[in-house]
């Protein structure tokens, strides 16, 4: 059985490892970075493609290589990719699974310092209006910096990025100096987040509601301990998705996969 996996997340690595341990399957994983492809290969993916793929090219690959199922395990905020993948599966009449990581359980967490917004533009305006006196930690990826920089001076802006050429080029283009860049991979621990808040004398942190696997709880707890604000961008809602195609953990994924092909 051949699986076309849209990856680039920790979820996708977990999926690769689970499938290779439990099923007889060939997996092609697509990511937007060489780093993501490297992790997918290490996780057991048989093939990787490390570049953004337009819809027509994905369709061509799936048709030419006879893939049996399309799994979308991209980031919750990669809404356009999920919309595209669902459209492709519908067009090709092929099995489709969307792995949607659970939202963060904040039941026992102090959320009084969280300001929820629906977009990065809204986040930038909020900072300009209410948090313009201190420094800003941007823990929401290189692709979203431009919306914030419109409202925040570069000298007050400290983004956490992957140290890859595309991210470094974006920073240079936006005028963000190298000594403001926080190069890290993986979710930061509570201690690491506290250290970054202290080091850069931040008054506010920007993050996405990317789930526990994205380190959201550690960010909130660090902000609480250091008494700074958090601006949380809410997840986009994708209306095109059929709820029956969504799974949120490996057990649910297993049930779906079992309906398509047998375990080893």
Region annotations inferred by a language model:
Residues 172-195, 200, 204, 209-226, ...:
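A C-terminal functional module that forms or caps the active site or interfaces directly
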Residues 59, 65-123:
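Glycine/small-residue-rich loop that forms an oxyanion/phosphate-binding "nest" at active or ligand-binding sites
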Residues 28-52, 107-109, 170-174:
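N-terminal beta-loop-helix "entrance" segment that forms/cooperates
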Residues 139-181:
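Anionic-ligand binding region
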Residues 68-69, 135, 203-204:
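Structural motif
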Residues 31-37, 100-106, 142-144, 163-166, ...:
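Short, polar loop motifs at secondary-structure junctions
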Residues 43-62, 182-192:
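Glycine-rich, highly charged phosphate/nucleotide-binding loops
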Residues 4-43:
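N-terminal glycine-rich anion-binding loop in soluble enzyme alpha/beta folds
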